[in-house]
Amino acid sequence: MIREIFVGNFRKNGTLSMRQLVRNKGGRVIFVEYDLGIGAMLTPVYRLLIDLAIKEALCRTSNEGNVYFFIDEFRLLPHLEHIDDGVNFGRSLGAKFVFGIQNTDQIAAAYGRDLAHSILSGFGTTFAFRVNDAESREYIKELLGKNIKLQTFMSAVQNRGVTEQIREGYVVEDSDITNLPVGQAIVCPPGCLPFRFQFRLYESPVSS
C-alpha cells in the first residue's frame, strides 16, 4: 500500500517539513499542486500535508503570526481531520482559510451534510460567483436572508394606473446569481450589506 502511494516526487528523500515551516514562519510560501492524473492515489499524501500544517497552526498557544491556507477545488481533499476546528476556531490563533468550491453538494458528498454545513458556516466572508445548481443558489440566498420588497408595476386593469405590492423576498434572488457576468461576484462580508464586485483580469507586471 505504501509503495502504491509514494510515487513520483514523493518517492524521493524530502527536505521540507510542514511543521517546521509553520513553526518557524519567516514568510515562506508552500505550493502543493494536485496532479489530476494520479491525484486520487496521492490523496492521502495531500491530506497529510495539509492536516499537519493546520494542526501545527492550531497548536500554538496564541496568535504568533498569520498562517494562510489557500485551497482551490476543496472537494479534492476529503476528510481533512482538522479542517472544521481550523475554520471555526483557528481565527484567534492566526489561521486564515480561503477556499474555492464549485458547489455545495460537492462538499456535502466529501464531508457529509452536517460537517459540510459546519465548515461553510465558519467562513466570515463569501464571494459568490455565478452558479447554475439550485442547491448552491439556495445556500447563497439563505446566507444573506430575507427582506421586505416593494414592487411597483402597471396594473393589467385599465384606469387603475400604477399598482404597488409589498412582499417578502430574498436579499439576493436567483436571477441576481444566474445573471452575474464572468469575473463578477456578490461579496457577502460579515455585518455588512452584500455588494457586487468586478474582478480585473490578472496581468503579469511588466519588467522594466
Predicted stretch roles:
Residues 85-87, 107-208:
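P-loop NTPase motor core of the ASCE superfamily
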Residues 75, 103-105:
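Acidic, glycine-rich active-site loops and adjacent beta-strand->loop/helix elements
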Residues 32-33, 70, 100, 128-130:
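Conserved beta-strand segments of the P-loop GTPase G domain that flank and frequently precede/overlap
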Residues 96-102:
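Structural recognition of the conserved hydrophobic beta-strand(s) that form the central parallel beta-sheet
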Residues 1-95, 111, 163, 172-199, ...:
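P-loop NTPase motor domains
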